[in-house]
Amino acid sequence: MNIKSLLLGSAAALVAASGAQAADAIVAPEPEAVEYVRVCDAYGAGYFYIPGTETCLRVHGYVRYDVKGGDDVYSGTDRNGWDKGARFALMFNTNSETELGTLGTYTQLRFNYTSNNSRHDGQYGDFSDDRDVADGGVSTGKIAYTFTGGNGFSAVIALEQGGEDVDNDYTIDGYMPHVVGGLKYAGGWGSIAGVVAYDSVIEEWATKVRGDVNITDRFSVWLQGAYSSAATPNQNYGQWGGDWAVWGGAKFIAPEKATFNLQAAHDDWGKTAVTANVAYQLVPGFTITPEVSYTKFGGEWKDTVAEDNAWGGIVRFQRSF
């Protein structure tokens, strides 16, 4: 009897204690709903919605390493050894729809290291040494508006502040910005575009017209012509020699990971440049590009260089993300 009463009493005590704990329990608040990042496919691959907004953001960039040998195809001087360079670039694109159209921003951050203090390689197209005959400045802050007609036609107007190149500063020195306007028509066959730019620092203008033709889905060619009212390379938009310059090129995309590129250029002062390369995608996101360039300094360019001919080569390793 005593043992049985003790067991029942212990059980009653446990029930009472459990009841007391249940009565005093703290009710946890409901967790807030988790808003997962949503993919935004309206502007191409890689965009996502910034949480809580209707703005689409893309973050992308690359890391590259260059090894150069032979002559400097810009100045005609002998490198006397290997030149090396590295760059990390991070780009941010934002886009959102408004009653006036798409509102977009673009920002690029670059961190460079070069053994020869050169920063102007690989600014255009599919080439590393693609500015043997330069066509204009490559970096600026700007405000631009682009009209897209929906039928392949587009137009752009921009106000630019200019920027620094390797040896020159093309930044505006007053309240008047550089002004740029352009038209473009694109279709399945290719595209044609023209642009006119006014340099407010030297008060001169330059214009360029380019056409691209897709011969097949793997082979394409292009041609560009330019004219400047100031016959000097020391300007923002017409950095070739003389009044005019012409460029042309071709691209072939091979079935197995390789793209072949060829480009040639000539300007009014007599400089001729040819560049060829093969961009080989070893794995997705990683490309190795060996390239060779030749520049002939003729006419008025002879007085500015040590040698009339320059041969140079470069191998680029680039990881894009």
Curated annotation (Swiss-Prot):
GO terms for biological process: monoatomic ion transport. InterPro entries: Porin_alphabac (IPR003684). GO terms for molecular function: porin activity. It is a multi-pass membrane protein. Keywords: Cell outer membrane, Ion transport, Membrane, Porin, Signal, Transmembrane, Transmembrane beta strand, Transport. Belongs to the alphaproteobacteria porin family. Forms passive diffusion pores that allow small molecular weight hydrophilic materials across the outer membrane. This is Porin Omp2a. The gene is omp2a.
